[in-house]
């Protein structure tokens, strides 16, 4: 939506159009989220690196890091691919990016069903399906409709995947989810 608005009214106009939505979301979250209890017990300060002693953490963080590297690498080249290979104009580009976003919203809504049924299989299948999607894009890059469908599938998977990784952190480190989350963010940003 932001890309489409940016094409039609400029990037400043796009930001201004989204301000009321952001304010509405802020107010809705303020009203609807429950207050969190404050843990007044002093927890000992420990190094986040101690989490690497938990056997599943190094492997999981490596898989998480590889997933995000692949996702960001592909996303970096989406626009140039669409403009040069698929020959998509500015309006089509905005619509395809909107389709990626809508598909991502849908994926985020439904990924919990798959995570609850087959957690690790879902975490494994998402990057495999994304890699297959990227490979197929190379084969059908000349067809705008095929590219739009494949990128929508990619958006569905790519946006749902972080939900799985945050769930993994909470399950792998139930007593240290905050520290594990910080470590995961550091791995992703590396």
Q: Where do the language-model regions lie?
A:
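Helix-loop-helix hairpin linking two adjacent transmembrane segments in secondary transporters
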Residues: 1-34, 77, 81
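Juxtamembrane intracellular "pre-TM" segments in multi-pass secondary transporters
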Residues: 32-63
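Pair of pore-lining "gating" transmembrane helices in MFS-fold secondary transporters
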Residues: 53-73, 148, 152-156
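Short amphipathic helix-loop junctions that connect adjacent transmembrane helices
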Residues: 76-91
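Short hydrophobic/small-residue motifs within alpha-helical transmembrane segments
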Residues: 98-102, 189-190
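Helix-to-loop junctions at the C-terminal end of transmembrane segments
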Residues: 106-119
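C-terminal transmembrane helical hairpin of 12-TM major facilitator-type secondary transporters
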Residues: 119-165
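A late C-terminal transmembrane helix in Major Facilitator Superfamily
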Residues: 171-190
């Amino acid at each position: 939506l932001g890309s489409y608005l940016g094409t039609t009214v400029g990037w400043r106009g796009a930001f201004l159009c989204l301000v009321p939505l952001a304010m509405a979301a802020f107010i809705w979250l303020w009203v609807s989220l429950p207050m969190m209890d404050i843990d007044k017990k002093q927890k000992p300060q420990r190094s986040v690196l101690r989490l690497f002693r938990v056997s599943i953490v190094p492997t999981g963080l490596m898989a998480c890091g590889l997933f995000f590297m692949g996702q960001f690498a592909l996303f970096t080249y989406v626009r140039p691919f669409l403009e040069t290979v698929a020959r998509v104009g500015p309006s089509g580009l905005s619509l395809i990016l909107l389709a990626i976003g809508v598909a991502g919203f849908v994926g985020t809504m439904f990924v919990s069903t798959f995570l609850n049924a087959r957690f690790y299989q879902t975490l494994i299948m998402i990057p495999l399906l994304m890699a297959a999607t990227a490979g197929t894009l190379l084969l059908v890059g000349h067809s705008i409709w095929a590219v739009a469908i494949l990128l929508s599938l990619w958006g569905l998977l790519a946006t749902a995947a972080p939900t799985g990784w945050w769930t993994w952190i909470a399950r792998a480190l139930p007593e240290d989810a905050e520290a594990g989350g910080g470590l995961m963010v550091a791995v992703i940003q590396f």
